[in-house]
């Protein structure tokens, strides 16, 4: 079973352009998601203690996929952004929670993945920051 860590605290540093999501849960190795726009890409750094995964998906693709997400009962993630080797699997829950699974695939024998959950308030901040326009709006 997957263990999703909630990211319910967010900080937008307008000086550096860094958007940070973290957990309010007091734990020694709290997960953290840092994002920064870099031209046509978004640099993501996902860390959990000393382990970090860095991805650079195209911002237009991320914006488009987030705008088309709908909750599908029984499925955790329904879309992916990136390539077959490095991607973010995304899923929207019926309560507005966004599931994110940044993944690095080694080959057919394994992968490294972070299971993150953005609360509805955190998701709203992300959507505004990326510039998401929902298809149903």
Task: Give each language-model segment a name.
Residues 1-137:
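Positively charged, low-complexity terminal tracts
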